[in-house]
């Protein structure tokens, strides 16, 4: 009976330890996030783990191109990450950002300027055995600007990301 209890404890401890390791996220990740809402474009993306509960900060600096305007934006998010199984994780987050709009539709009344935005985030990611992570996410954004119809106040931003973990 003692042998059975010892073996059961070792097996349970090994399973728990393996599960904890599978859930750990990298301290840092740097790469590209490519997607679009009001236009299509790339973002340079940096993630930094914070705390010990698989939470992280994500900062994205990017450019969106549309036939009538361009947007450069910086978004910061706080994300909570949960393991699904093995290398698969899912995450949710919330944050804010600032953007600059260059609108060339209505000359001479261009609607250029900066605006603030709030953002949410939900997605799924896969951590490969090599230090790469591939992600797919939806980031709904709510912009606070006087837009004269250039862009919507609400924009769902779908994107795919590839980041190097270190």
What are these regions, as identified by a protein language model?
Residues 1-4:
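Positively charged n-region of N-terminal signal peptides that target proteins for export
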Residues 7-15:
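Bacterial N-terminal signal peptides
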Residues 16-23:
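Sec/Tat signal peptide C-region and signal peptidase I cleavage site
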Residues 26-28, 38-42, 70-74, 88, ...:
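Residues that define the transmembrane beta-barrel architecture of outer-membrane proteins
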Residues 26-56, 61:
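Start-of-domain marker
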Residues 27-28, 59, 105-106, 142-144:
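Extracytoplasmic loops and strand-loop junctions of Gram-negative outer membrane beta-barrel proteins
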Residues 47-136, 164:
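Gram-negative (and chloroplast) outer-membrane scaffold detector with strong preference
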Residues 69, 129-166:
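Predominantly the C-terminal beta-signal and adjacent terminal strand-loop region
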